[in-house]
């Protein structure tokens, strides 16, 4: 029984000593850092949080109130976790800002390039439009030599024919200047026309000369059967082709003449008085049989 009582007394003493250790400085007046290791760990954690706050000031240039409150007010693990989250958020905010700055620098350059490309395209379209307009004007405007007859009315054409003559048996190498010089003494020459075959491009051997007045036509008839480039030319007033008129100045129907002209080789003696040298023989197979006779 004595052994049991001694064991019980020892356990009671140990229990009392444990209560004194938990009580801390209020019971014995000692420093909590000596008997309570948890108290010393809390101070060290606060010092570490302060050091981390100072480092964040050097990196970010400023500290938010949330860092200090998170470091001192929270527990050891909670304060450190909140500080790391705040630092990560600041880094994430700074990085997008840098990227946004780079984009703002590149965007004006791209816009300038696009604007320049648009200007070049507009200039190209304007040039195409100008070229099309010039081509249309060139196609619509006839040559100066053909502009007059195209716009002339029937009355004007008849009046011009009354001032013109037909010159036959003209040398194939003759030019308009030579014909104008040959008839220059008869009056002022307004225009000289030498007709050519549309298939071969060779001259047909006759020409038209238009004077400025009708008196010159009567004067030019004196040059009938005169020599021009070694040939005896035929000079007669130009006849105006009128629609609906089937007769000619020769006194026989025009349709009858054309029907016989298709076989002019067998009846060439009939027309030999008008044309000393039938010119239809030069264009064998290609020139029309009527080209040597029809002056108009």
UniProtKB/Swiss-Prot annotation:
**A GO BP term, please?**
mRNA 3'-end processing
Molecular functions per Gene Ontology:
poly(A) binding; RNA binding; RNA polymerase binding
The UniProt keyword set, sorted, is: Coiled coil, Cytoplasm, mRNA processing, Nucleus, RNA-binding
Query: For bias kind Gly residues, which ranges apply?
Result: 71-82
Annotated tissue distribution:
Shows dynamic spatial expression throughout development. First expressed in the animal pole region of the egg and this pattern persists through to the blastula stage. In gastrula and neurula embryos, expressed mainly in ectodermal, neural and epidermal regions. Neural tissue-specific expression pattern persists into tailbud stage when expression is localized to the brain and spinal cord. At early tadpole stage, expression becomes gradually confined to the specific vesicle regions of the developing brain. At stage 39, expressed in the telencephalon and mesencephalon regions of the brain.
Q: Where is this region: Disordered?
A: 1-106
UniProt feature, compositional bias: Acidic residues: 84-97
Give the region (Necessary for homooligomerization) as residue ranges.
146-296
Q: Which residues form the RRM domain?
A: 163-240
Give the top-rank taxon of the lineage listed in the UniProt record for this protein.
Answer: Eukaryota
Q: Which residues form a coiled coil?
A: 107-141
Compartment(s) of residence: Nucleus; Cytoplasm
Which Gene3D superfamilies does the annotation name?
3.30.70.330
Q: Which PROSITE patterns match?
A: RRM
Name any GO cellular component annotation.
nucleus
What's noted about domains in the record?
The RRM domain is essential for specific adenine bases recognition in the poly(A) tail but not sufficient for poly(A) binding.
Subunit arrangement?
A: Monomer and homooligomer. Binds RNA as a monomer and oligomerizes when bound to poly(A).
The record's PANTHER family line, in alphabetical order, gives: EUKARYOTIC TRANSLATION INITIATION FACTOR 4B/4H, POLYADENYLATE-BINDING PROTEIN 2
Task: Give a short account of what the protein does.
Answer: Involved in the 3'-end formation of mRNA precursors (pre-mRNA) by the addition of a poly(A) tail of 200-250 nt to the upstream cleavage product. Stimulates poly(A) polymerase (PAPOLA) conferring processivity on the poly(A) tail elongation reaction and also controls the poly(A) tail length. Increases the affinity of poly(A) polymerase for RNA. Binds to poly(A) and to poly(G) with high affinity. May protect the poly(A) tail from degradation.
Q: Please state what the protein is called.
A: Polyadenylate-binding protein 2-A
Q: Which organism is it from?
A: Xenopus laevis
């Amino acid at each position: 029984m004595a052994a049991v009582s001694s064991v019980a007394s020892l356990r009671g003493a140990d229990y009392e000593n444990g209560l004194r250790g938990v009580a801390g400085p209020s019971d014995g007046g000692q420093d909590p850092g000596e008997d309570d290791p948890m108290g010393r760990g809390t101070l060290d954690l606060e010092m570490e949080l302060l050091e981390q706050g100072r480092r964040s000031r050097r990196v970010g240039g400023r500290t938010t109130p949330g860092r200090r409150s998170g470091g001192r007010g929270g527990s050891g693990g909670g304060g450190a976790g909140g500080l790391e989250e705040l630092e990560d958020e600041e880094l994430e905010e700074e990085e997008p800002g840098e990227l946004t700055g780079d984009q703002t620098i590149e965007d004006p350059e791209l816009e300038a390039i696009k604007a320049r490309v648009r200007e070049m395209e507009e200039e190209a379209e304007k040039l195409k439009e100008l070229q099309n307009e010039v081509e249309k004007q060139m196609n619509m405007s006839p040559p100066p030599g053909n502009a007059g007859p195209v716009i002339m009315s029937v009355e004007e054409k008849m009046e011009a024919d009354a001032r013109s003559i037909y010159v036959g048996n003209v040398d194939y190498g003759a030019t308009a200047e030579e014909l104008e010089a040959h008839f220059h003494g008869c009056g002022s020459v307004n225009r000289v026309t030498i007709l050519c075959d549309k298939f071969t491009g060779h001259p047909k051997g006759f020409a038209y000369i238009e004077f400025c007045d009708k008196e010159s036509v009567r004067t030019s008839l004196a040059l009938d059967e005169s020599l021009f480039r070694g040939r005896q030319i035929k000079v007669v007033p130009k006849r105006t082709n009128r629609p609906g008129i089937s007769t000619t100045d020769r006194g026989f129907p025009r349709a009858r003449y054309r029907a016989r002209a298709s076989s002019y080789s067998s009846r060439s003696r009939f027309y030999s008085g008008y044309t000393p040298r039938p010119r239809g023989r030069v264009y064998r197979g290609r020139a029309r049989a009527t080209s040597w006779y029809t002056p108009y």
